[in-house]
């Protein structure tokens, strides 16, 4: 078991307040390509532990990169702090150590949200346009996070029909996605 001090609710260098409580790393809930997620004795919080595993081509190629988990943890936490500073809510609570972070338990929406300002990559290929075209307004794309299906592209109506999100959640996702793009 891993013991750590965690502030209840909001904490850290963001001016967050709350009482400290002890938290133990409990049962593993999930293991993916890049991280493991553990429950804590407080049902509102989880501990994310970043791995050194590396994958490519939807997991077909695998390897290990020493220190990758540490870098991913640091980058993720700095990004979450930047987003919160700019009015985008996140699940970040507190960095425990170089590899682990306490996060709020949230509903996982199995969508990848892509904002494009310029035609590139799969967009250019899919629509048969030249790379590098600057769009007059950013575009938004969604893909269904499902390795077995190859993360297919879908629109908001598809996501709602599949029960992945509600109409209200779709609007919230779009609002914050464009806000993140403006922050960059």
Protein language model regions, located:
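Short, positively charged and aromatic/hydrophobic N-terminal segments
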Residues: 1-3, 10, 19
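Short linear sequence motifs
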Residues: 7, 22-23
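Active-site loop/lid in soluble adenylation, ligation, and acyl-transfer enzymes
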Residues: 24-143
């Amino acid at each position: 078991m891993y013991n750590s001090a965690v502030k209840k609710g909001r904490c850290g260098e963001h001016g967050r307040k709350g009482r400290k409580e002890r938290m133990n790393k409990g049962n593993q809930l999930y293991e993916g390509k890049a991280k493991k997620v553990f429950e804590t004795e407080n049902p509102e919080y989880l501990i994310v532990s970043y791995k050194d595993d590396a994958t490519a081509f939807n997991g077909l190629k695998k390897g290990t990169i020493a220190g990758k988990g540490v870098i991913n943890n640091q980058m993720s936490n700095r990004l979450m702090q930047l987003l919160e500073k700019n009015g985008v809510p996140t699940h970040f609570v507190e960095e425990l150590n170089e590899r682990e972070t306490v996060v709020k338990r949230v509903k996982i929406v199995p969508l990848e949200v892509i904002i494009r300002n310029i035609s590139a990559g799969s967009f250019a290929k899919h629509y048969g346009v030249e790379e590098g075209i600057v769009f007059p307004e950013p575009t938004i794309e969604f893909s269904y996070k499902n390795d077995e299906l190859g993360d297919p592209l879908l629109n908001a109506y598809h996501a709602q029909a599949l029960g992945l999100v509600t109409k209200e959640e779709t609007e919230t996702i779009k609002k914050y996605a464009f806000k993140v793009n403006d922050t960059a």
